[in-house]
């Protein structure tokens, strides 16, 4: 367990905490909203700058780094492969600024114990914690037996084709950990289906009825359990003859069956259905080896007995054959900002520095 290295970890933080914070701020100042390809830069110049920043920093810290055709960067602790590979994953791309911001969205401001700016929470702060976790091993000479790597992506907020490309080239790890959630661990993500129903007549009454059915019961995708969570279905847009829906449902219902049930509903109502987005979810028991280890580590470090949870969002974790999410946010944190501010994707996105340092200790 990491407790064996408590002294080394805390001494490392004393030396490098301020440097880590400054590097998060510098990365936040790169407005890396993924865009169209520009020359050799697959996701635009700013995303390329963010990847280059991470690659350069990794090399400065004595780590090994490789650019995977601008889809992302792989950072390695060891030059040569080892038997078991543990892959950490985070991303540099961000969603565009939104809402009324008190602080410059790409300012990388430190105030009231927070790093403020777009991407500080999602996912540049956690990314730097992971990078410095690898640097810790290099700096102290502590040598994990596993082949420890970090994937730095640049298209997570769009479609996660970046990590798909990387995994196709590098292969699946023995276990993957995405740092794009809240602690303690995310041990599953729900299936995601976006779909559009089209009719030849006005269906406003039916749309209202389906909008009220927030659990997808009429579509035949409702399920609820303590283990896998509960289905949710939201009407995204509509007019008289069409409506678009965003469905999130547990992996206890195969995604193919969910599609079949939606198609059946459409047929019964003389409608056409078009699936706009499809992402298969995952589940791993928190009692399994690595998830259980991570959960115990979290509880020992924080003194909290929080439980593992299933999320409706989508992260790199669903792209692993086996893996989970682990931090770096604090669930239900009350931040000292106006209502609606401070969260990921919101105005004045703000990463709690103490929470980030605690994440680094656990990584």
For each predicted feature, which ranges?
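Active-site metal-coordination/substrate-binding segment of hydrolases
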Residues: 83-152, 341-342, 346-358
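Active-site-adjacent substrate-binding region
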Residues: 214-218, 225, 281-330
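Short beta-strand
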Residues: 64-68, 274-275, 309
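Zn-dependent metallopeptidase/amidohydrolase metal-coordination segment
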Residues: 12, 304-362
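Acidic/His- and Gly-rich active-site-bordering loop/insert found
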Residues: 2-115, 144
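Midchain, well-structured core segments that form catalytic/ion-binding scaffolds
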Residues: 155-157, 161-266, 279
